[in-house]
């Protein structure tokens, strides 16, 4: 008799995806972050669901309802901080996951990669709207500043912003719709993640060498299930440490002040995971130019398959490209630091130079380095 695992319509899908899936024998810990992102998403949906049971999306009571969750709801403080810091862990895993894809040439799986870029945009949109919900000072002013960027779009800009606001400023209508979108988007993200996996399983996983691993496959279970569980334990340990010892480490103290449209905070800045893009936005003095640079800083990922000029897929055997990759990582860390600094000398010029370097590295230097390495192969 054939195992039910291989015949049952539902079990068959699970079996093909997580049990009997043929996986390369040499994928490193950098391949753990896909499963960690899945865990983060499940955690965010569950904690978010319990928060939504006690949260009210009204400008008069939103801030109070979050205070109520932290003070009066059983383990409400834990749920709230797991959700807030879970977002930070989500983005850490996301950035590493994307970085892994860039380093090892995973972007050559076009469908998987493009769905991934869409997922990145969806997660960023969700995180932004979630940050508005507690209705603190940074929530309100962050929402005002970021939505206002759309007014830079010629002709339709102003109408578009007022349509998103549901009025002439960020107010009750804005908060209510942001809550609605913040609730629905994670489920859309989960569906997209399913499609992401579907496309991945059409080709099979890439591996550190960038070579075909068809001749050397091992079953996903038990080898990678146990490896993913280890990764999950480390993730849970890191998140628990953050939540229980310094839950406000990555947050902004200004968000403990209720939103006040009449009082602008001295430094409006987003959460740490958006600072690199915020620095690129601020480094261009023109509003529309800044918005385009902001969008393109993420959208540039979609161009990666077309900018690949190397004869090899992975950077494993390409030392010049490796140096440029780590320079790009350092540049992004610099941009993250600059995004959190006030707009004054020397931060402005550092931000502008880092922004120029970011685009130059991806669009010019890395493709040129790949061509150079191709020629070095002939020696």
UniProtKB/Swiss-Prot annotation:
Residues bound to heme b b566: 97, 196
Cell compartments where the protein resides: Mitochondrion inner membrane
Keywords (A to Z) from UniProt: Electron transport, Heme, Iron, Membrane, Metal-binding, Mitochondrion, Mitochondrion inner membrane, Respiratory chain, Transmembrane, Transmembrane helix, Transport, Ubiquinone
Any one Gene Ontology BP term: mitochondrial electron transport, ubiquinol to cytochrome c
Binding residues for heme b b562: 83, 182
Coiled-coil portions: none
Keyword Transmembrane helix attributed: yes
Membrane protein topology class: Multi-pass membrane protein
Protein name (record): Cytochrome b
